From Swiss-Prot:
This is Large ribosomal subunit protein eL34z. GO terms for biological process: translation. One of its GO terms (cellular component) is nucleus. One of its GO terms (molecular function) is mRNA binding. It comes from Arabidopsis thaliana. The keyword Ribonucleoprotein applies. Keywords: Ribonucleoprotein, Ribosomal protein. Residues 31-51 are annotated as: Disordered. Pfam families: Ribosomal_L34e.
Length: 120
């Protein structure tokens, strides 16, 4: 006769967080083993792309004790948070804003010189 299986924990509903698989133990018994959810990995909040170079783990497994720092991040500004293209875009935007400020300042000085020159 077939061995009956009983859930060992949680509730009996077939939800995503309560998935099981049947495993045969060394003693020959069949038991339910809880399966973990598949990890999708960290995403960039700006572009929505997956961040390269970081393993796909469940959120609790990124903790200090389970994963060393060099495996949690990428070695660049905003490493492990933003994707490379988002960081590049941000750097270029910041540079252009600073350039615009300088241009404004120069134009203001030129205008001031023009106002002073005709009077003399």
């Amino acid at each position: 006769m077939v061995q009956r299986l009983v859930y060992r924990s949680r509730h009996s509903y077939a939800t995503k967080s309560n998935q099981h698989r049947i495993v045969k133990t060394p003693g020959g018994k069949l038991v339910y083993q809880t399966t973990k959810k598949r990890a999708s990995g960290p995403k960039c909040p700006v572009t929505g792309k997956r961040i390269q170079g970081i393993p796909h783990l469940r959120p609790s497994e990124y903790k200090r004790s389970r994963l060393s720092r060099n495996r949690r991040t990428v070695n660049r500004a905003y490493g492990g948070v933003l994707s490379g293209s988002a960081v590049r875009e941000r750097i270029i935007r910041a540079f252009l804003v600073e350039e615009q400020k300088i241009v404004k300042k120069v134009l203001k000085l030129q205008k001031a010189k023009e106002k002073v020159a005709p009077k003399a």
